[in-house]
Design a protein with these regions (language model features):
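Membrane-embedded alpha-helical bundles that constitute the cytochrome b-like, heme-associated redox core
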Residues: 1-226
Length: 226
C-alpha cells in the first residue's frame, strides 16, 4: 500500500512539473513540446488508473458541499485535459502529422484556453487534496512546526500575491475566455523567472481551493453541532 502511495505521489509530482514546463512552450523546440505533451497525457492516464476507486465511488454515498466541489473540479479537469489532448493532435506538426489532419486553425482556437483551464484546475485540484499532504508531513515530523509554520504562512501569502499579480499581468484570465487572440509571451524573460511565476500562479489557485475546502468543512461541523 505504501509503495502504491509513493507511486501516486511520484506520478502527481511528475505531472505538475511537466505541466509547468509545457506552459513555457515558447522556450523550447516544438518537437520537444509535442513529445513532452504525450508524456504528460500518459501520466494523466496512469494517474486515473492508480485512482480507480474515485471512478467507482462517483455514484456512492452522500454528496456534501465539499464533495460536490471536489467532484466538480475533478470532472472539469478531466474534460479540460481531454480538450487539451484532442486539440494537441489537431495542431501537431510532428508526432501526429501522419494523420494528415487539416484542423490547425480550429485546434489553435481550442488548445490555448483548454490548456489554461486545465492549468487553473490543476491548482484547484491540488488545493482540495492539500490537507492529505499536510497530514502526512505532520505525521512524519511528529512535532508542532511553531516558527517554521509562521514562516511558511508568510511565504504562502507572498507567493499568492505574486501569483495573482502574474495571472493578471500576463492576461491569463483573458485566455480562459478567449478574450484575446494572441498569448502574452515574453521571449526576453529567463526560464527560472518564468517557472517561479507559474509556480506562484498554481499556488494562488491551490491556496484558494484549500481554504475554501476548510471553510466548507468548518461550516459542516458547525451545522452538526447546532
Amino acid at each position: 500500500m505504501k509503495a502504491k502511495r509513493a507511486i501516486k505521489i511520484g506520478v502527481d509530482l511528475a505531472m505538475t512539473a511537466l505541466f509547468l514546463c509545457q506552459m513555457g512552450y515558447h522556450m523550447m523546440d516544438n518537437r520537444a513540446h509535442e513529445w513532452l505533451g504525450i508524456a504528460l497525457c500518459l501520466l494523466f492516464i496512469l494517474h486515473h488508473a492508480l485512482n480507480g476507486e474515485w471512478h467507482r465511488a462517483l455514484f456512492r454515498g452522500k454528496y456534501s458541499a465539499q464533495r460536490i466541489l471536489l467532484t466538480a473540479v475533478d470532472i472539469l479537469l478531466v474534460l479540460s485535459m481531454a480538450a487539451v489532448i484532442v486539440s494537441s493532435v489537431m495542431v501537431s506538426r510532428h508526432a501526429f502529422s501522419f494523420l494528415g489532419l487539416h484542423l490547425r486553425g480550429l485546434g489553435r482556437q481550442l488548445h490555448r484556453p483548454a490548456t489554461m483551464w486545465a492549468f487553473v484546475l490543476v491548482g484547484l485540484h491540488l488545493g482540495l487534496h492539500w490537507s492529505m499532504v499536510l497530514n502526512a508531513v505532520r505525521k512524519k515530523t511528529r512535532r508542532k512546526a511553531g516558527k517554521a509554520a509562521a514562516a511558511l504562512y508568510v511565504l504562502l501569502v507572498l507567493a499568492v500575491g505574486f501569483g495573482a499579480y502574474q495571472f493578471v499581468h500576463r492576461g491569463l484570465w483573458m485566455e480562459l475566455f478567449r478574450l484575446r487572440e494572441l498569448a502574452f509571451l515574453d521571449y526576453g524573460e529567463t526560464l527560472p523567472y518564468f517557472l517561479l511565476s507559474y509556480m506562484a500562479i498554481i499556488a494562488l489557485w491551490t491556496a484558494g481551493s484549500y481554504y475554501l475546502s476548510k471553510l466548507l468543512k468548518n461550516r459542516k461541523k458547525s451545522v452538526k453541532s447546532a
